[in-house]
Amino acid sequence: MTLPSAASSHHRADAFYRRWQRLNDWLAQHREFWQPAPFADPSPAWTKNWPALADRVARLSDSDCVQWDDDPVALAEWVAGALPSFREFGELTGIQPLAVEFADQNTLPEVRATDMPGRKRLQAGAFASAIQPLKHNVLDWCCGKGHLARTLAPLCGGDVTGFEWNATLVDDGNRLAGKFGDAVTLQCQDVMAENLTMPPDAHGVALHACGDLHRRLMRKVAGEGLPRVSVSPCCYHLTEALDYQPLSRRVRASKNGLELTRNELRLAVRETVTAPKRVREQTRRISRWRLGFDGLQRQLRGVDAYLPVPSHPTRLTNGDFATFCRWAAGNRGLELPGDTDFGVWERHGERRRQEVRRHELVRHLFRRPLELWVVLDYSMFLEEQGYNVRLGTFCERQLTPRNLLIDAEKRSVDC
């Protein structure tokens, strides 16, 4: 959803708000599909309220699940066969790409992309292309080793600075910049520090800064009236606040606005399209074990309720189900009977994994709507602070599902 540059700030802000309101109402209408977590709730309410849809979902094959996961719009159309309100999905979530015609030539050559994973190199190149031209000094926010900063340096006529709190990454990044002759300076800086000083005339950029970090950048840029900010947000749930705190006045004033918890925000970033096959297989195995143990603990406790188990030690990943169960039981203070049939419970876990996989297909349809709900709030905030905002995608979903870009330029006085 990009808006023409000629559109007035008033019309842009109104368009963002109308889009946000539609998403808000649609999400509220469909709470039963996205609020319960199938992993913890074997029988979410929607499976009883919409039995025709539940039956269709239960009959999906594994290959169907893979196909639908890769095409949310087509999945929504399929779900609409049982629940017509899902036909709005495509219109609600459609968003235009920002200009990325020269992504290849703006990407760091592989020979200069030391310590830079291939996908990150391509993401940085696409991001750089989408924010051309660069007219100001650039500040790479939470820059790590400065991969984005080094990508932008040849395209920028001004200074390129990076802020990063990890001193080791700063040292490594400055060595890389020196090795390849990049006009980049990284500084060891906690961006959440109260006394943070921003470089003058800075264009703040952030590629996949998390939660409070990207929110801090937008507030800091707006508060100091800096000329531009370009953000691809990520991990919206990584905040100190337990519930989502809207940035824009219009969202805060809305009487029917959703009140999202951190856990609900986490749903927006639960996608694995970029995970290697080995990681996906490992995830399936651990899910089977956790769901198998969940069935076992419900029987042992005589309580039909999910019992959270913390992250397991890495050493267990390549072990077996019985070892995992003994660790989980010990962690939760449960005693496993000596005659526990682990084979029965592992098979139970696989049945539940298949069920969860299908129920999550429906729940995952709400990832993009939730993400857009948040990003539209950010966009309205920046419009309210005197910026012209472009909102769109900077790359294809297959490169990264976190492909939204907010690009905001300070309005001139006569606008």
Which residue stretches match the model-derived regions?
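Class I S-adenosyl-L-methionine
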Residues: T2-A52, M192, M198-C415
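Conserved Class I S-adenosyl-L-methionine-dependent methyltransferase catalytic core
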Residues: D41-Q132
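Class I SAM-dependent methyltransferase "Motif I" SAM/SAH-binding loop
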Residues: G118, C142-G146
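Conserved class I S-adenosyl-L-methionine
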Residues: H136-C142
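Conserved SAM-binding loop of SAM-dependent methyltransferases across substrates and taxa
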Residues: K145-G157
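Conserved SAM-binding motif I beta-strand of class I
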Residues: D159-E164
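Conserved SAM-binding loop
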Residues: G173-N174
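Conserved SAM-binding strand-loop segment of SAM-dependent methyltransferases
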Residues: G181-V191
